[in-house]
A protein has these predicted regions:
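Hydrophobic/aromatic-rich transmembrane helices and adjacent perimembrane loops
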Residues: 1-9, 22-26, 30-67
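Transmembrane-lumen/periplasm boundary regions of multi-pass, lipid-linked membrane glycan transferases
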Residues: 1-17, 37-38, 84-94
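Membrane-interfacial loop-to-transmembrane alpha-helix junctions, especially the N-terminal start
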Residues: 14-28, 73-74
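Sequence-level motif detector for i,i+2 pairs with an aromatic at +2
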Residues: 29-31, 120, 209-212
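Catalytic lumenal/periplasmic loop and adjoining terminal transmembrane helix
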Residues: 39-41, 65, 69-206
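C-terminal functional modules
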Residues: 200, 210-217
Length: 218
């Protein structure tokens, strides 16, 4: 609905003002929309962010057209929107920080291991864990040896199904997230970074903990 509203706002500005600024703003919004919806490999909220300045300008231009004596009232909805935006930012920060914290905990836990520590997935955890020597699991180029550790982040991508008869479970680590808002948690419909996780830029719901499964190769 927000997307429809933005497009309607753009076309309304073009129809009413018919000036160079309207054309520029229209191309800005429509160009970003076409790229994000039709050319990017995945529909994500962040690919729509480049149109944010243009949308803000369109909103201000729309407010200027209002001649109502209560014109200031149009700004009141921005206050709760600002609060929600800040809460979303905090939730997203906490989600990102769990990757760094999980990496720190696993480093302390397995730094004395004689075998190799392998990790699945991508994104932040992949980056932080590699800094202390964990290796990405790629069965086409390397096979874990007996006694090696494999860490599997649940809320992640490109996970490899491990044969149960070849590994033994050691532990499941959980890290708490922001309690009722998330931008990218599997099963909540929130897919800010990729629509593969869901169609929503964020979700207000009960947010499960980030989980990391740890197994040892038999």
């Amino acid at each position: 609905m927000v997307g429809i509203g933005i497009l309607a706002l753009t076309f309304a500005d073009l129809a009413q003002r018919k000036d160079a600024d309207s054309v520029l703003l229209g191309l800005w919004v429509l160009g970003t929309f076409c790229f994000a919806a039709f050319f990017n490999w995945s529909i994500t909220a962040r690919t729509f962010l480049p149109m944010a300045p243009a949308v803000a300008i369109l909103l201000v231009r729309r407010f200027d057209l209002s001649k109502s004596s209560r014109a200031n009232a149009v700004w009141l909805p921005l206050l709760p929107a600002a609060v929600v935006s800040l809460l979303i930012a905090v939730a997203d920060y906490q989600l990102a920080n769990t990757a760094r914290e999980a990496s720190r905990q696993f480093h302390a836990r397995f730094q004395t291991e004689r075998g190799t520590v392998w990790l699945e997935g991508q994104w932040g955890f992949h980056y932080y864990a590699q800094q202390w020597g964990a290796k990405p699991l790629d069965l086409q180029h390397a096979v874990p040896a007996s006694g090696d550790i494999i860490i599997v982040p649940f809320n992640n991508t490109n996970l490899i199904a491990l044969p149960r008869e070849k590994v033994v479970s050691l532990e499941t680590a959980e890290l708490r997230l922001f309690p009722f808002i998330t931008t990218f948690t599997k099963g909540t419909g929130a897919g800010f970074y990729s629509s593969v996780w869901g169609p929503l830029p964020f979700a207000i719901t009960s947010v499960p903990n980030e989980r990391y499964y740890v197994v040892r190769v038999k």
